[in-house]
C-alpha cells in the first residue's frame, strides 16, 4: 500500500533569516520568487521508503506521468498496487480514470474521506521534508529546490532503509540462537 500526495508549489526565494530591531520597528524585505516547483511523492509503509519527483505544474498530465513512474518502479514484482490518496481533482478526472483502467490496471485508487489529511501517512514526511530541506534555505532556482528535495528523499531512505535492515537482521539472529 502506497500513500500518495503532492506538495507545492515550493518557491525558490531568499529567506532573510532572523534580525534584531526595536519592538516598534517594522522590517520590510521584498522577496523575489525565482521559481516554483511541485513535488509528487509516495510513501511505502511496508519498507518505510519515500519516492518523489518534481514537476513545474500540478495537473493531470503530471499525475499520470508520476503514476507511470510508480508502475515502472515496482515492476512485475508486485501484482497489485493500492494507492491511498486525497480527493484532489487531478486524481478524479475522467482522463486519469480512463488511462489508469486502460494501461495501469494493477493500480487501484483508495480515496480518503474529504478533509482528512491526517489519514495519509505521507503528510508527516512532507512536514519533515519542509522543516529539514526547505525552511530557512536559500534557493536560486527550481533546480536547487529539486536537488534539496531529492537529497532529502535519498537521506530519508538511507536512514530508514538501514533501520529496517537492522531490525530484520536482529530478528534473524534471535531466531538462530
Kindly give the residue locations of the regions a language model identified.
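Short aromatic-enriched loop/helix-cap "lid" or pocket-rim segments at secondary-structure transitions
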Residues: 13-17, 95-97, 121-124
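Short, basic/hydrophobic alpha-helical segments
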Residues: 62-82
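Mobile genetic element proteins and their domesticated derivatives, centered on retroelements
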Residues: 3-5, 42, 48, 67, ...
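C-terminal anion-handling pockets and recognition modules
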Residues: 122-177
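RNase H-like polynucleotidyl transferase catalytic core
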Residues: 26-32, 101-121, 137-139
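Acidic/histidine-rich, metal-coordinating catalytic segments
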Residues: 78-91, 120
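Conserved nucleotide-binding/hydrolysis micro-motifs of P-loop NTPases
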Residues: 7-9, 46, 89-90, 116-118
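Extended, low-complexity cationic-aromatic segments
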Residues: 1-68, 169, 176-177
